[in-house]
Design a protein with these regions (language model features):
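Conserved G1/Walker A P-loop phosphate-binding module
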Residues: 1-49, 162-163
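Helical mechanochemical/support elements of P-loop NTPase systems and associated helical scaffolds
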Residues: 12, 25, 54-58, 71, ...
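Conserved catalytic network of the ASCE P-loop NTPase/AAA+ motor domain
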Residues: 20-23, 30-35, 66-72, 95-99, ...
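Hydrophobic anchor at the start of a short beta-strand
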Residues: 37, 103, 137-139
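Active-site glycine-centered loops adjacent to acidic/histidine catalytic or metal-binding residues
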Residues: 41, 108, 143
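Flexible beta-alpha connector loops of hexameric P-loop NTPases
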Residues: 45-55, 111-114
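Inter-motif core of Ras-like GTPase G domains
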Residues: 54-83, 94-106
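Canonical P-loop GTPase G-domain recognition
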Residues: 112-163
Length: 163
């Protein structure tokens, strides 16, 4: 949600919680003046401290969502730079690959690491993504707090949406 706020240059567009995984439903954000173009905030159930039963429900829901939405143009996968490529992250990338959608990984909270550590993580993630997903997935460092990478992300999304 904080990435959406940074992307759209609005501090309170998407509700942000200190606890990861609080988004528990699909939240659609229109992109005026572009009719029928939306950003969608998905449940971060891989990070939420919720019962296994609820996680299973979200997973089934997202399976259906990704399987039935022909209008999807790309998927931004939000990963904590300190803990990248968790099972949930791989699952989200799998959704994109099965649908033939481009995916773009943002390694968030990059301001929490030094430049060297952030760069090392970026390189390691880039290598693993190239090994497992070829050229279908791009990756960058990102910080909603310091605005690092916001312009790059905006450019990727604009390209997908033809803006």
């Amino acid at each position: 949600s904080s990435a959406l706020n940074a992307l759209c240059q609005q501090n309170a567009l998407a509700r942000v919680s200190k606890t990861p995984g609080r988004t528990q439903q699909l939240v659609f954000f229109g992109l005026p003046p572009h009719e029928n173009k939306y950003l969608v905030d998905l449940p971060g159930y891989g990070y939420a401290k919720v019962p296994q039963e609820l996680q299973a429900h979200w997973q089934a829901f997202l399976d259906g969502y990704f399987g039935s939405r022909d209008a999807l143009r790309g998927l931004v996968v939000v990963m904590d730079v300190r803990h990248p490529l968790k099972d949930y992250d791989r699952q989200m990338l799998g959704y994109a690959m099965r649908r033939g959608l481009p995916a773009h990984v943002i390694l968030t909270k990059a301001d929490k690491l030094g430049r060297g550590a952030g760069g090392n993580t970026l390189q390691a993630v880039r290598m693993e993504l190239a090994r497992n997903y070829a050229d279908s997935v791009s990756v960058q460092l990102f910080s909603g707090e310091s605005k690092l990478g916001v312009d790059e992300l905006r450019s990727v999304v604009a390209g997908w949406l033809g803006l």
